[in-house]
Structures are given as structure tokens and as C-alpha cells.
Amino acid sequence: MTKKIGGLTAVNKVNLEIGDDQIVGLVGPNGAGKTTLLNIISGITPPTSGKVSFCGEDITGMKPDRICRKGIAKTFQIAESFPDLTAKECVMIGVLFGNDTAPGMKEAQSQALSILADVNFPLEKAETLNRNLNVVELKRLQLARALASRPKLLLLDELTTGLNPKESKEAVELIRKIRDTGISILIIEHVMSVIMGVSDRIVVLDHGEKIADGRPYEVVNNQQVIDTYLGDFNAF
């Protein structure tokens, strides 16, 4: 896939394959093209060239809502939600409109509460307006809303941003739990301990180009990756 924005090539001939029940970590410096790549896959922005195939079907150019119904859901870097809806109502939107088989309202409410519980959202705040939730709660709500569409592939854009180490560890455990339900995951993270802790493979982008793709410890010992990215991290 290639994406050009004006005179900038944000993503340059990147090939990426995600297997069943696999967690793929996507890392790279700021401006490397990571979020743009997720936006291409989810239909938010079309590629300039190349195509996106999902479950054997070419979904290039489909609108985001249709791609969601095909089985791809996405969370966003900034945890925002409809401020005047409750947490439960927000997840119900995903249950009712995120796929082609919508249940009745009573069942949608039940499913929404179950999904909120699955992501460790405090159920005593299920009727709280989203404007009154804290960052951790908004992150979990955003994840619940994505899961409500029953995706086969989940795209996570910096899920742990704004979380403390304990909360990040809980997020890692939750990501593994989601994968164990049969959902493949493509995750962008700057926290290398998170990426190393959850990923089956790590893909590294730099200036829109893929410079590495392999098992976590192969990638972090790749000299080009160290020079362009990991050199900034004392942990390595």
C-alpha cells in the first residue's frame, strides 16, 4: 500500500499480512506512517495505490461503516466518545449498528453491559455520561465500543497512552484476553514493554517504509531498527 498526501509519501509500498489469532505490533518514530496505515485498513482514508484484502475480499475504497460490518474495528489515539451519551448507550450503538445482524433493544442493552464488564469498565458508571469519565474509563469504553461490532480484526492506536504502569499492565492482559477469543489484533504503541509483552510479530515503519518485520527479539536486535528507533529507549 502507498499513501501520498500532497508532496509527502506517508506510506510507501508497505506489505502487511496479519494471521488468524495473531497480535502484530506496529512501531516506529513519530510521523513514520503508523496511524495512516491503520486509517487505510479501516477505510478512513483510501490508499493512493495498492489494495486492502480482508478474508479474501478486496475492501479497498469501502466506506468505514461497511468495513466495520465486514469485521474490522478500530480504536483511536485520543480517547473520545459522544459526551452526552452514557457509556452503556455508546456501546449499544456498536451492538446495534456495527454489524449486519442487530438484536432488539433489550438484548442490545444486555450485550453492552456484558462487553463493558469484559473490558473491566466499572459497571456502576454504565449510566454515567461520557463527559464525566476519566481517561482510563474512556480508553476502556472505546475498546468496548469497538468490540461491540464483533470484529475479526481489531486495530488499536496507542491504547496505553495516558495510562500508568499498573494500568498499562492491565491493558496488556486485556489485549491477550481479546486475542484468545479469536480476534486478530494490529496495535500501535510507543511503550516498548507493551509491544514486547503482547506481540507475536513486530513491524517497524520509518518514513513510511517497512524496515523490519519479525519476532519481537529478532526485531529489537535488528541494527537498523536500533539506529532509527530503539536507540531512544534506555530499556534496550
Functional labels for PLM-detected ranges:
Residues 1-236:
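Glycine-rich phosphate-binding loops of nucleotide-dependent enzymes
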